[in-house]
């Protein structure tokens, strides 16, 4: 796969079935109509949908009043698609906080936010190829980010502090090293978390087993004490009966009362 091959075919922000702003690849004529049909046929009671067919992934996230939809190449990692939706969501929230688009969002029309979100789509779609320079931002192009990482060795968290900056472009190879590093860190964290869970499970299993043994021992001891108390009561009753029988024999001088 070449570094300038496009992996993002389409992306949009919608309210209901109204497309507020969108990005569509010029190499995919008619993809806007396909995307609109997908949004119109979203099944009810779903907040997240992802479907891969013909080497393309159709993903949609519904967050409150807005829907975020994208058509991606199937090789795009899940973490990258999540970043895409988070970037679109943060851009929409910024516009809502600004208040300048309140009327447009109350009664939305097609592409009413297109001009305001074009820079965001340009940032997301930047791939660093010469034929796509018109889509690149000065601070959002993969080349500038690669240079910045090489010179300053900045972490991903510090990059998040720059509002509007590209954290992890979906396309191209300039951030391949960063993506591999992040994947290794994620795998290491997952392995550590899994080991921790196994340790917790082992300790918890031992605790449950010890608890069952202790409970069984307690029941056995309680049963033994109950039996002992029953025998004591029976023996006490027997002693009383024998004493009363002896008194009766003494008064009657044997069995003369019965004979009389």
Swiss-Prot record:
Keywords: Membrane, Protein transport, Transmembrane, Transmembrane helix, Transport. It is a single-pass type IV membrane protein. InterPro entries: PHYL. The keyword Transmembrane helix applies. GO terms for biological process: protein transport. Its main location: membrane. The chain crosses the membrane at residues 231-251. Residues 12-114 form the Longin domain. One of its GO terms (cellular component) is membrane. It is found in: Membrane. Belongs to the synaptobrevin family. PANTHER family: PHYTOLONGIN PHYL1.2, PHYTOLONGIN PHYL2.1. Non-SNARE longin protein involved in membrane-trafficking machinery. This is Phytolongin Phyl2.1. It comes from Arabidopsis thaliana (Mouse-ear cress). The lineage of its organism: Eukaryota, Viridiplantae, Streptophyta, Embryophyta, Tracheophyta.
